[in-house]
């Protein structure tokens, strides 16, 4: 069967997602004596950003502009000089409690230090998931007994095997704010001839790998991030964040889009736990670029994910905030990307600096421990380069610095402090790394990832190492 062209797959994707976007049933009239919630506010991203600065008492003029990654002639062009890349070389002490007690045992990590790190990320970086997030109810259409031509996630092309495609929608209870509907869109593709429950790789945004996963006998799940939360600041009074806030602007510690997308992945995993065709103990999470950031956040916060493929996540993902290279904290605190983060994160692009953050990316990676986590990038330079914006070296440094947490929990880290050249993989441990020569994609690393991940997804299921920290 011929491979599906990318344009055809995209059109099919749009058709499927549109078919899943039916509004939830209209809520009935409010009970006698209860006041209806106010209408959701309509704001531009700039207006919403300014409201957050007002709450933080930060003048807009005090927010530092981020570097320019496109124009080398710009006065604020990104730094690519390694001599200037580490103005704050000292990272937060990952294995030291707030009370200055060294963390020398797994028990102390699980009981004390890990919860401390989670609290820092909640309060200062990604924001808090509300305690009263509405319930999600999953609905499914009859399975599509199609072959590869009915595939999904077009970069995978023709999987070459018969498949079962399930189109699902997770309807979020909006009875408290009927003006906002959230319908989480998920497409699950399974090998039709599987002898029993199969592992599944869940991917944010359809980043590819479907063909390789299905060829291995695994399933592939496409999760639509924008069906959970829009990827812009103007959407913060809608989506799951807006629904929880009844259409009103965020408070400083409220969650941003990265945390909301990760929450949506957990709710999709809730569904997979009910599907008898899926081995829910062997579900991985993956994403590329901003969705690579989301995949790392999901992996860090949701211990039910068995393995992670973190693609080109850069600043806000696997890259050290304290590195002065490529994209910076100041890019994430500007009005174009602030919606990914908690409002409180804006402080670190204004009156505070990245060195004032109580945590850094090495600790986000450490929250994934002891589970296998593969960090993927394209090469910074040379033929087929991804470029320098994502700071490959800063992410490698973070992975190296996360290694002690993996070793503390009895697992192997990268095994070296020297970043290997492109197309040389570090895959001997539960922390893995590879750069390819194929640009801004995970595609050329998928085969290496699958061979590495099979060591974990093909073995006995392991119980989660800790209870899920976010509410249903």
Question: How would you name each of these model-derived features?
Answer:
Residues 265, 292-303:
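Short glycine-enriched nucleophile-adjacent loop
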Residues 307-364, 391-418:
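Mobile cap/lid helix-loop segments that gate and shape the active-site cleft of serine hydrolases
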Residues 340, 393, 400-471:
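C-terminal catalytic histidine-bearing segment of alpha/beta-hydrolase fold enzymes
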């Amino acid at each position: 069967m011929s491979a599906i062209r990318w344009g055809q797959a995209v059109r099919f994707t749009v058709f499927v997602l549109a078919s899943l976007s039916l509004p939830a049933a209209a809520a009935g009239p409010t009970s006698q004596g209860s006041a209806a919630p106010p209408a959701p506010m309509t704001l531009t991203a700039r207006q919403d950003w300014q409201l957050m600065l007002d709450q933080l008492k930060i003048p807009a003029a005090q927010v530092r502009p981020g570097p320019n990654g496109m124009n080398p002639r710009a006065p604020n062009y990104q730094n690519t000089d390694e001599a200037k890349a580490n103005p704050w070389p000292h990272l937060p002490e990952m294995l030291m409690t707030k009370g200055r007690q060294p963390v020398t045992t797994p028990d102390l990590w699980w009981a004390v230090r890990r919860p401390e790190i989670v609290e820092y990320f909640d309060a200062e970086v990604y924001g808090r998931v509300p305690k009263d997030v509405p319930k999600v109810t999953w609905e499914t259409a009859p399975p599509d007994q199609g072959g590869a031509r009915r595939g999904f996630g077009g970069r995978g092309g023709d999987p070459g095997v018969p498949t079962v495609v399930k189109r699902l929608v997770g309807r979020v209870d909006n009875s408290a704010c009927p003006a906002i509907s959230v319908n989480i869109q998920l497409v699950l593709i399974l090998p039709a001839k599987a002898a029993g429950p199969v592992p599944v790789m869940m991917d944010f945004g359809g980043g590819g790998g479907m063909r390789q996963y299905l060829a291995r006998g695994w399933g592939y799940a496409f999760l639509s991030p924008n069906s959970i939360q829009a990827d812009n600041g103007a959407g913060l009074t809608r989506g799951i964040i807006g629904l929880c806030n009844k259409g009103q602007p965020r408070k400083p510690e409220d969650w941003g889009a990265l945390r909301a997308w990760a929450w949506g992945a957990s709710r999709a995993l809730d569904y997979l736990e009910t599907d008898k065709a899926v081995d829910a103990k062997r579900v991985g999470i993956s994403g590329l670029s901003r969705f690579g950031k989301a995949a790392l956040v999901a992996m860090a916060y949701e211990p039910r994910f068995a393995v992670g493929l973190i693609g080109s996540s850069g600043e806000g993902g696997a890259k050290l905030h304290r590195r002065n290279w490529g994209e910076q904290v100041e890019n994430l605190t500007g009005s174009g990307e602030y919606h990914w983060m908690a409002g409180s994160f804006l402080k670190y692009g204004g009156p505070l600096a990245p060195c004032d953050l109580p945590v850094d990316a090495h600790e986000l990676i450490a929250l994934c421990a002891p589970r296998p986590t593969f960090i993927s990038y394209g090469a910074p330079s040379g033929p087929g380069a991804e470029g320098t914006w994502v700071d490959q070296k800063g992410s490698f440094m973070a992975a190296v610095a996360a290694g002690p947490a993996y070793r503390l929990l009895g697992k192997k880290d990268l095994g070296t402090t020297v970043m290997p050249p492109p197309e040389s993989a570090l895959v001997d441990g539960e922390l893995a790394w590879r750069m390819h020569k194929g640009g801004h994609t995970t595609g050329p690393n998928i085969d290496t990832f699958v061979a590495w991940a099979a060591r974990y997804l093909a073995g006995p299921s392991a119980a989660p190492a800790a209870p899920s920290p976010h509410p249903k």
